Amino acid sequence: MNTLKNNAEILDSFRENPDMMAILTIIRDLELKDSWLAAGSVRNFIWNLLSDNPAFDCDTDEDVIFFDPDVSYEETLALENKLREDFPQYQWELKNQVYMHQHSPHTEPYRNSCDAMSKYPERCTAVGLRLHANATLELFAPYGLEDILNFQVRPTPHFLENEDRMKLYQKRLSKKNWQEKWKNLTFKNT
C-alpha cells in the first residue's frame, strides 16, 4: 500500500498526474470567483493512490465549486453543460456555493467556498485544491487530512450539531457504497 507522509507529497501526486493537472488548469482558466476542485474529486484521488489503484478515476465526478453571487443557478448549469461539451472525457459537476446551503437543513448562506467546504457532510470530503496563475497548488482541508489518510469517514462539526443534518449524513452514506471500492474504510458518527 502506498503511503503519503505530508501535504507536499500529496500536492506532488496531483502535480504528477496529467489528468488532474488538466482539470485544475481548465478550472483555473474558467476564471470563476473562488473556484476549487473539491470534495470527492480530491478525496477519491488520494484514497485511490493510497490503495494502489490508478489515482485518477474517470468515473469520479469532477466536483468544481465556486462562489459568485452574480452568477445565477441557470448560468451555472449553462457553464456546466459547456464544460461537458468542451471536455467530455471528464464527469463535470459545477456548483455555485452561493446556493448550496439550501441543500443542508438549517444552514445559513455560505460566506465563500472555504466556508461551504467546511460544512460538507464528511470531514474527509471537506477538501479542495486549486491551481494558481503562477502554477502553485493550494490545498484547503479545514479538518486536516488525517481522516482521508486513515480511510476514516465521520461527520463535520456542522453536521454533528444538528439532528436533521445527521439524518442527511446517514442517508448519504447509505447511498455511496464507498466501502465496495475502499475496503479499509471505517465509519463513525462522532
Language-model-detected regions and their locations in the chain:
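Catalytic cores of the polymerase beta-like nucleotidyltransferase superfamily
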Residues: 1-190
